[in-house]
Amino acid sequence: MTETQSLELAKELISRPSVTPDDRDCQKLLAERLHKIGFAAEELHFGDTKNIWLRRGTKAPVVCFAGHTDVVPTGPVEKWDSPPFEPAERDGRLYGRGAADMKTSIACFVTACERFVAEHPDHQGSIALLITSDEEGDALDGTTKVVDVLKARDELIDYCIVGEPTAVDKLGDMIKNGRRGSLSGNLTVKGKQGHIAYPHLAINPVHTFAPALLELTQEVWDEGNEYFPPTSFQISNINGGTGATNVIPGELNVKFNFRFSTESTEAGLKQRVHAILDKHGVQYDLQWSCSGQPFLTQAGKLTDVARAAIAETCGIEAELSTTGGTSDGRFIKAIAKELIELGPSNATIHQINENVRLDDIPKLSAVYEGILARLLAGNAV
C-alpha cells in the first residue's frame, strides 16, 4: 500500500516527548486536523491530565476510537539505537517511543477518518475520538473522568475501538474482545519481634503465614469459561525482617494480585482470601485495590465487522482473545454497547527500540476505514 499520510502523522506524534501525563500538544494537533473535516472538539482537563472528546455528527450509532497520547519513560536513552523521540525508519520498521503504544494507532484512525469522510460526507451516525494523556500513569484523571462526563449527559457509544497494540505475529491476527479484572492485595502479617535463639518469646509471621500461603497458591479460584482463562493468583512481593540474621521479624508484608475472569467477583475473591487467612489463624491487616472489573464483548456485529475488515486488508482471520493486561477499555465499557481493542504488534511495547513494521501502518489505517465503512456507510460485512 502506498498511503503515507499515516506514517507522517505517526512520526509527528512520536517526535513529541509526551511522557505521562504530559500531552505536549498532541491532542491539539489531532483537533486541528480533524476540525478540517467537521469534528467538534471538547477539551476535558483534570489536574495535569489533558483529555479531548472529538465528535462528528449528532446521531446514532456512535463509532468511537479510544486512545492515549502519553507514553512511558524511555529508559536509558544511550541504549536506544536512535533517539527515542526522533522517529527513525530502518530495517522496514518505524522506531520511537510510542510507535506501538499507541501513537501509530491514533495516526491511523485519524487518516482513516479523513478518507472515509471524503468519500462519505453524509455518512450515517457519528464518529468520535476519546483521547487521554493519562493511560500509562495513574489513570485517575483520564478516560475514567471523561466517561463520567459523557455518562452524566447520557452520551453513549455504540461501537468502540481501543487502539491498543494487539497483534502477536502479524497485523490483524488478534482482537481483544474483553479483559480480565485486576484485584490487588497489600497484606501485613503481624508477629512479634525477638531474638532468633529464643523463638518461644517471639512470633514469627513468616512461619504463621506459610500454611496460608501454600493454600492460596494451590487454590482453584475458578475454571474460566469460553472467553476467559481461569482466574490467577500471583504474589509479586514478600518482605520481612531487619536484614540481620539473629532477629525474628515482627511483620511480614505480602503484595499479591488476582487477574480474574467473569466467573469470579471482586467480593467473592476477597471473602475467600479472608476465609483462608482466618482458617490458619493469621493475624493480619489487608488493604484491597481493584483497578478494573472484567468485561466482555460477545461475538457480534463489531467483532464481525472488524474481522471482515481485517480479512479484506490483511488476508487473515482474526482470533478473539481476552488475554493480557488491563486497558482503558475497562472504563469505557460502562458507556459502550460493544468494545474491542485492535492495533499493531505488541512485541516491543515499553521496550528499548520500540517499533512497528512500516508496511503495517497503511494496512492498519485501511482496517479502521473498513470498520467505519461497514458500520456507517452500509457496506456489507
Swiss-Prot record:
Q: Which reaction does it catalyse?
A: N-succinyl-(2S,6S)-2,6-diaminopimelate + H2O = (2S,6S)-2,6-diaminopimelate + succinate
Q: What protein am I looking at? A: Succinyl-diaminopimelate desuccinylase
Pathway in which this enzyme or protein is active:
Amino-acid biosynthesis; L-lysine biosynthesis via DAP pathway; LL-2,6-diaminopimelate from (S)-tetrahydrodipicolinate (succinylase route): step 3/3
Q: What SUPFAM superfamilies would the database entry show?
A: Bacterial exopeptidase dimerisation domain (SSF55031), Zn-dependent exopeptidases (SSF53187)
The UniProt record gives the binding positions of Zn(2+) 2 as D101, E136, H350
Q: Where is the active site?
A: D70, E135
Q: How is the cofactor bound?
A: Binds 2 Zn(2+) or Co(2+) ions per subunit.
Its job: Catalyzes the hydrolysis of N-succinyl-L,L-diaminopimelic acid (SDAP), forming succinate and LL-2,6-diaminopimelate (DAP), an intermediate involved in the bacterial biosynthesis of lysine and meso-diaminopimelic acid, an essential component of bacterial cell walls.
State any single GO MF term: zinc ion binding
Needed cofactors: Zn(2+); Co(2+)
| Enzyme Commission code | 3.5.1.18
Gene from which this protein is expressed: dapE
